[in-house]
């Protein structure tokens, strides 16, 4: 509880700083990937840049939609109805899984026709397709992590998100550098390596956030990943009712 303006400002800074560093880490990974790909070849740069902009469009909407869990959990915490948090958490995972499946189907059916319509050079189009295939390995954990991170952040544990996302940023940079140029015994695969770098970072995020949910004293009482909850149309609809407008507004 805070009583003075200084205390409120300090609390805001404590919450805002980790979130700010988290966002810079998320953006920084992509910047490094595109920069390194540009150093490798212009064709790979064109393919990766096109692929990045395509998946980012869908991801921003999905990320906004999955934000619907945050106010629900915050409300439950305020009302001290924590028994329902585990159920809400699983509905977020189900929504993330559904969104990932939709994105995959759209990609499988529409990617090549779209690249043809964009008149992308054939060599760059092949790099784009291979990059997105590599990225797809991390698509499910990428969307699951939104639910995990939002749950952690709802409990005021934003410093964990900062540490985890920064760690995944390091993993992303390492895999990008290693796979694009073929360093440290890794194969040289050019721009496609940027896709594997993102996928590796996504799985790193998922594993580390899962460990926080399983081990942190504030969170382990929910028995997440131990007591599974079936899909609930009521809770899924509630999250989508809040999240979809956020997704469109972003």
Which residues does each PLM region occupy?
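Short alpha-helical transmembrane segments in multi-pass integral membrane proteins
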Residues: 1-19, 73-140, 186-244
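Transmembrane helix-bundle signature of multi-pass secondary active exporters and lipid flippases
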Residues: 17-71, 135-142, 237-250
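Alpha-helical transmembrane segments of multi-pass membrane transporters/permeases
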Residues: 96, 151-178, 192-195, 199
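Short, well-ordered alpha-helical segments in soluble proteins
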Residues: 132, 141-144, 148, 152-159, ...
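Helix-capping/transition residues at the boundaries of transmembrane alpha-helices
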Residues: 37-38, 74, 153, 180, ...
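Small-residue-rich hydrophobic transmembrane alpha-helices
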Residues: 31-34, 45-108, 142-161
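Alpha-helical transmembrane segments and their lipid-water interface positions
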Residues: 22, 26, 30-33, 59-66, ...
């Amino acid at each position: 509880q805070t009583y003075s303006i200084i205390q409120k400002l300090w609390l805001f800074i404590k919450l805002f700083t980790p979130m700010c560093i988290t966002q810079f880490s998320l953006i920084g990974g992509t910047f490094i990937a595109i920069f390194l790909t540009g150093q490798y070849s212009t064709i790979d740069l064109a393919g990766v840049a096109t692929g990045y902009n395509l998946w980012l469009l869908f991801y921003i909407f999905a990320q906004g939609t999955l934000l619907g869990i945050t106010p629900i959990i915050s409300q439950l915490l305020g009302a001290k109805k924590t028994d329902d948090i585990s159920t809400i958490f699983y509905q977020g995972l189900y929504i993330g899984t559904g969104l990932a499946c939709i994105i995959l189907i759209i990609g499988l059916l529409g990617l090549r026709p779209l690249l043809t319509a964009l008149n992308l050079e054939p060599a760059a189009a092949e790099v784009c397709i291979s990059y997105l295939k590599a990225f797809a390995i991390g698509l499910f954990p990428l969307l699951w992590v939104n639910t995990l991170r939002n749950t952690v952040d709802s409990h005021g544990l934003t410093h964990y998100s900062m540490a985890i996302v920064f760690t995944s940023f390091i993993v992303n940079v390492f895999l990008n550098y290693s796979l694009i140029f073929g360093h440290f015994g890794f194969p040289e695969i050019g721009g496609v390596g940027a896709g594997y770098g993102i996928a590796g970072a996504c799985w790193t995020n998922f594993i580390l956030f899962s460990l926080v949910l399983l081990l942190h004293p504030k969170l382990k009482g929910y028995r997440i990943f131990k007591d599974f909850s079936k899909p609930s149309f009521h809770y899924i609809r509630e999250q989508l009712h809040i999240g979809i407008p956020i997704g469109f507004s972003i």
